[in-house]
């Protein structure tokens, strides 16, 4: 038989088999657009604005629908009711970590963010217990954040009111807090090694939010066989991990099992029991990836939120003026802000919540995975199916937040000007995979922002109406545009 005919026949059979398999799966899963063989529904998604694509599809297929990202089905949850029902009401079943091939390859299934099953449960339980032992949620951690806020203010004074890009200064503050927890150390804001780490973290966030990385996560074979910016992610991640491995080695040499100093010490003393399935070498690798997770998540999300907050405060000077008026009334000029002040500062609290709602930092959260076969809203979702939760659809719900595209602290104030909580506020996600550092992040945002506004007036380099607050990139994260400002001592 002609080899060309054999090839055509074989490809046709594979094509028909692919169609049959996808058709069979779609009969059980929630509805969704018809996928093409191999590439799935990728042509129906704008990789530069995935959130809008998800919203458009939800208008056709409802709040629970299926997309094929490549050959794999992914269930998308859109809107508060669907997200809450899955992550809270069926929290255990939706607690798996979905596939994110770039980070899956970098972490090898270890750490606290991208691990699964018992590895994740044990690591998260150990991490939360250890963080509490180290002062998380207590006065001692507040003292650390207050001291770092003082250092941040002093560093901003050194700019002498000249124009500056706040990216790395704002990154240093939360990074120093998490460093003090992980390995009981902090860095000078001008330390070259420290700034190099900040740069690598910032670069990872930017690259992970590019369209190319969205394509790579859909077609992971590209990671191994194509050149591209994904290799920079692996290189930067390895540099950060190796830096932390050196810290781990230093701790091994100076460890006193009777007096644990920090997270690394606690893990070296007790972590092996929690992660006993790993050989020693892999336990150290697991520790390195766990502290890399804490280091990265504890730095980049908070620093990006702080940076975006300053941009919005420059854009809306009337909001800044109200916050500074409240700071003057409650705290004054000479006392440092503390967490007890927050309950007496409803407008400031509302402003910070509105920043987090408006910037929609991680629009689709990290992917989840169902841990068992589950019947959800009369649909059957098989074990191992990827699930995307559109946090953007919750944070920008027009019934809960009228005019959601508008930055307005009034979204979190009642008619009497008191702070108003909202169940729809879930920038840290919700359920069993909620961010482990949520409490610390909230503390840092309040203390850092109030300390800055207590000591400085923010001066833009252009007229406020000309300031663009549109994200530079929207992918894994919403990345703010680069900008400069002047910190004028008040």
UniProtKB/Swiss-Prot annotation:
GO annotations under biological process?
A: arachidonate metabolic process; linoleic acid metabolic process
Stored InterPro entries: Cyt_P450 (IPR001128), Cyt_P450_CS (IPR017972), Cyt_P450_E_grp-I (IPR002401), Cyt_P450_sf (IPR036396), Cytochrome_P450_fam2 (IPR050182)
**Pfam families, from UniProt?**
p450
* Species whose genome carries this gene: Mus musculus (Mouse)
> Which tissues and organs express this gene's product?
Expressed in heart and liver.
Name positions with the PTM N6-acetyllysine: 249, 375
Lineage at the top is: Eukaryota, Metazoa, Chordata, Craniata, Vertebrata
Concerning SUPFAM superfamilies, the annotation shows: Cytochrome P450
- What is the recorded name of this protein? Cytochrome P450 2C50
Q: Which reaction does it catalyse?
A: an organic molecule + reduced [NADPH--hemoprotein reductase] + O2 = an alcohol + oxidized [NADPH--hemoprotein reductase] + H2O + H(+)
Gene encoding the protein: Cyp2c50
